[in-house]
Amino acid sequence: MSYSNTSGYNFNNRNDSDNDEENNNSNNINNGNNRNNENNENNESLKRKFEESFDEDENNNNINTNNNSSNSNIQPPSKRQEINYNVNDISNDSSYHSDEEENSSDSDVSLNKTNNSTFENFKNNKNNNNNNNNNNNNNNNNNNNNNNNNNNNNNNNNNNNNNNKEEEGENFIESRTVSSPEISNTYVITINGNKKEIELYGKDDTTYNSQSSVSLPPLVDNAPPHIHHIDFNNNNNNNNNNNNNNNNNNNNRGGRGGYRGGHRGGRGASNNYNRNQQWHPSDGTPPPQQQHQNRNNNQQWHPSDGTPSPQQQQQHQNRNNNQQWHPSDGTPPPSSSHQNRNNNNNQQWHPSDGGSPPPSHQNKYQNNPGYQKRNNNQQQWHPSDGTPPPSHQNRNNHQQQQWHPSDGTPPPSHQNRNNQPFNRNLSPNQNRYPQNQQKMQQQQQPHPSD
């Protein structure tokens, strides 16, 4: 492949076997420039070069066509790349001058990019022979270009085959340097037939990559485990990628720790949130056993058990850790007395027993046998007893018998409810009747019930 422009730089990818022919052509062109129309072959060579730069209607179209055909298959370059600097096309930069150029006595040598005087001389000396030679040379050059293109295509095909073999079966981006044809590690510079090789950087140095390289920057140290470092020498990272992908696939399949299978747990009876084995609606149908542990760590009946079995005792532990009847048991047991829900160790009547209350029973508080009021340790009447007795103690903290609305008609005289001081050493009759008027005045007082 060749790159041609007005600056005079020709980048040619050629094999080493073509170096001799190339050097001869370069010498002929340079000698023709120095001698200025000495022979027709060199004249036509220089003339063709300038016409390639300025004649857009003829040669540039052919050159662009050839260049486009060669550019369609750009492949990595050969190890050696040659650059031909023609004397008439090199700029006046002193770094491009060789010792032979500086010591040359030929006054016709010019280092300007465009030698207009030489070009005018060649144009004035055109003749039929030169035109014929020019046509022949153009044909030869076209044939050579076609041959070079064919060789480049063959080389490109070989390179493609080699690259396909290397990357076969790999689904990852490899850190590989793919250089463009105009960039190579070693350049061969030819100035007036003198060759000089320049090595840009070492072959093993990967610090500088070509402009068209496909590579990623190296990652920082101590990176997370799921990020791997780029390896420029081997494919170990590919195995790491595959292993990571396999691990992710295993997690997605519902393995231990995976989000798809973490909730399955046991079958039939699963561990609920209280770490106790019991039935849960998520288990589906309840287990055969009618009784199981509920969520309160106490074995008892649960609505999920369905109807209690005949073998199951009618009484079972409720949720308060006390054995008693529960509405979930259905009909109360035959016993008219059972323990209530107040965690009391005293048997008493409960509305759930149905029917009328027994003649005497304990109330819902921890009291002695018999019936008594709720706030005192004294026996008293309760609405659950039915009709009140003829006389009873009131509900106030008095140790004295007195009238109560529940007694019906009040007695002729009674003590009031105001806790007035009285002589506790006297008998009740002495306190109730006016035998001691002074004491009675201190104790007896009017009451609305009078």
Curated annotation (Swiss-Prot):
Residues 75-90, 113-122, 361-382, 414-434 have a biased composition (Polar residues). Residues 1-178, 209-450 are annotated as: Disordered. Residues 24-43, 60-74, 124-163, 233-253, 290-303, 311-324, 336-355, 392-405, 435-450 have a biased composition (Low complexity). This is Putative uncharacterized protein DDB_G0284695. It comes from Dictyostelium discoideum.
